[in-house]
């Protein structure tokens, strides 16, 4: 099944501790996505002198389930659901379900 959300999309988080935050999709991993500056967690890292990595506490983005984000509609400024429309030539086009407006060019 094709993903309704792709890398580079502007999204709004609709559930969880970061509800309402907006950001850009950095990575899509199956049914999980990483959103820039959202769901920040602390990770403790060991020092690795061979790689030149200092140890300590590092903050980074953790993944969020894909069902907890909606694509931001620039026209309305809200997060909306995305569906697919099949064109006459057989191509699939992502569209907003509320307005039918196309996401992809």
From Swiss-Prot:
Signal peptide: none annotated. GO terms for cellular component: ribonucleoprotein complex; ribosome. GO terms for biological process: translation. The keyword GTP-binding does not apply. Keywords: Ribonucleoprotein, Ribosomal protein, RNA-binding, rRNA-binding. One of its GO terms (molecular function) is structural constituent of ribosome. Pfam families: KOW, ribosomal_L24. One of two assembly initiator proteins, it binds directly to the 5'-end of the 23S rRNA, where it nucleates assembly of the 50S subunit. One of the proteins that surrounds the polypeptide exit tunnel on the outside of the subunit. Part of the 50S ribosomal subunit. Belongs to the universal ribosomal protein uL24 family. This is Large ribosomal subunit protein uL24. It comes from Stenotrophomonas maltophilia (strain R551-3).
């Amino acid at each position: 099944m094709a993903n309704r959300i792709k890398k580079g999309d502007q999204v709004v988080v609709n559930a969880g501790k970061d509800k309402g935050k907006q950001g850009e999709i950095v990575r899509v991993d199956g049914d999980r996505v990483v959103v820039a500056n959202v769901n920040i967690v602390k990770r403790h890292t060991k020092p690795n002198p061979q790689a030149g990595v200092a140890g300590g506490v590092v903050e980074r983005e953790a993944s969020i389930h894909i069902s907890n984000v909606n694509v931001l509609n620039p026209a309305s400024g809200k997060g909306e659901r995305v569906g697919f429309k099949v064109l006459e030539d057989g191509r699939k086009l992502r569209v907003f379900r509320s307005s039918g407006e196309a996401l992809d060019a």
